[in-house]
Amino acid sequence: MFGKGGMGNLMKQAQQMQERMQKMQEQLAEMEVVGEAGAGMVKVTMAGSHSVRRIEIDQSLMEDDKEMIEDLVAAAVNDAVRRVEEQSKSKMGELTGGMQLPPGMKLPF
């Protein structure tokens, strides 16, 4: 079915793919993106692991109402999450050679 050495080659390829995925996950965890809201007046720096590393709020907003600042922070966090997802999808696409996965399925399985 697999031919001469086919099964061994298949196992070797699977192991190499697993190693590349591990390396890619490490790179993604180290990656940082910046989400913005309010024309850059609120910025959220987020790691590829989705942990928030820093929140910057322009001094001019400190005189505005609390609710507006909270809304802008939430919008900036959501923007950062979206950017992490886009970068992760792009990097994983490079790894898988553009192989499309079923909706909702993420790597690693």
Swiss-Prot record:
Q: Where is the composition biased (Low complexity)?
A: 11-23
Please give the subunit comment from the record: Homodimer.
Which UniProt keywords are present, listed alphabetically? Cytoplasm, DNA-binding
Query: Per its UniProt entry, which superkingdom is the organism in?
Result: Bacteria
The organism's lineage is: Bacteria, Pseudomonadati, Pseudomonadota, Gammaproteobacteria, Aeromonadales
Main localisation: cytoplasm
Q: Give the GO molecular function terms.
A: DNA binding
Q: Which GO terms describe its cellular component?
A: bacterial nucleoid; cytosol
Primary role? Binds to DNA and alters its conformation. May be involved in regulation of gene expression, nucleoid organization and DNA protection.
Q: Which family does it belong to?
A: Belongs to the YbaB/EbfC family.
Positions of the UniProt region annotated as Disordered: 1-23, 87-109
Q: Where in the cell is it found?
A: Cytoplasm, Nucleoid
**InterPro entries noted in UniProt:** YbaB-like_sf, YbaB/EbfC
Q: Does the keyword Cytoplasm apply?
A: yes
Name the UniProt record assigns to this protein: Nucleoid-associated protein ASA_2087
